[in-house]
Amino acid sequence: DITSDRGISSVAITYVNTDYGVGLADVYEAAAIARGIEVTAKTAHEGDKADYSAEVGVLSSAGGDALVVIGYLDQGGNQIIQGSLDTGAFDTFVLSDGMIGESLTDTFGSDLDGSFGSMPGSLGAGAMKFKAYAEANGVDPSVYVGESYDAAALIMLAMCKGGSDDSATVAANVMDVANGPGTKIYAGELKKGLELACAGFAVDYDGATDVNFTEVGEAFGAFLEKGIEGGKFTDVAQR
């Protein structure tokens, strides 16, 4: 959806040769074609090579309005972007969640202006509080940091509610502390939440990612559209 909304009509895709990369590349390709976007090439890259000129050459020959980079910053993604910029093959990049991080913009700066991607996240009250809380404590609130924080918090709250630290107790109580009803607990308020839960009061943990679970225990998720402007990542919209 984001690629289509940006007016891009053709893309080449490169993906890291792992289950993550293969699966996401297949899903992206199918979604792109369904929206009328031409996929000019789809090629894998290994995550531990010293030279990616061959991969960049194939992608450059195929062409496209943008290059979709599905992978990780430290496993070939940066090098493929560098090669694409150096050869003039591409100047707009569509980034998977594993490619979104401050190290990318620290390396390339405004050369990536106009590039974009998506990652799990929210623009809700909890997410904004977590971002401020993390930055105040010297933590980069990048991809999956909020989810990791919330997972640890939910385990501790479930232990408090159930009065035990065994896995069965956590499993039996985690839905209650995540979905409520009860006192809302946001990022940075874990101490308050633990005190309430351990004292027998009901809590509704929202945390950093506005946590809620379905009846079968799957997390409701939201995604952030991220753009690069002025050499920095910006939050464009919640999807």
Protein language model regions, located:
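Extracytosolic ligand-binding ectodomains
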Residues: 1-239
